[in-house]
Amino acid sequence: MSLTSALPSADMPRSMVWLFATASGLSVANVYYAQPLLDALANDFGISHAAVGGVVTATQIGCALALLLVVPLGDKVDRRRLMAVQLIALVVALVSVSMAQSSSALLIGMLATGMLGTAMTQGLIAYAASAASAHEQGRVVGAAQGGVFTGLLLARVFAGGISD
């Protein structure tokens, strides 16, 4: 048997690879939008400029909680269903952040956004790896991870443009 006959005949379509990369980038971007907006958030919520760093702290605590508690669920339950639930929860968290009237509501929303944005990102990368055939996993995971880096950087640029 030749090596070529052992390989699957259909590669993951480029559009699917781009979808994983884009979704990963958009998911992680939610975790980083607030950083350039801290001065505006301090003014809008009447928080001191020293205390507004709690927004980033809450988001990063959410990231850590996701890695410890939520991401491992992808090995135990159906990954597609888990990601669908996480997506709905992330949308709810983002809506709660956008409608926050108090600093405590903002912090809780950012904690949830950090947790769900991180969990979605990691889940998408793992799902991309499992959906790709063995010979293209590196390319697919690399594209998804590239989407993460691009989303992280562009989120800060976009939010920085809004804050100016």
Where are these regions (language model features)?
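Residue-level signature of mid-helix packing/kink "hotspots" within the transmembrane helices
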Residues: Y32, Q60-L68, L152-L153
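Interfacial helix-cap and linker-helix signal at transmembrane-aqueous boundaries
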Residues: L41-A42, L73-G74, F158-D164
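Helix-loop-helix hairpin linking two adjacent transmembrane segments in secondary transporters
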Residues: S103-A105, A143-D164
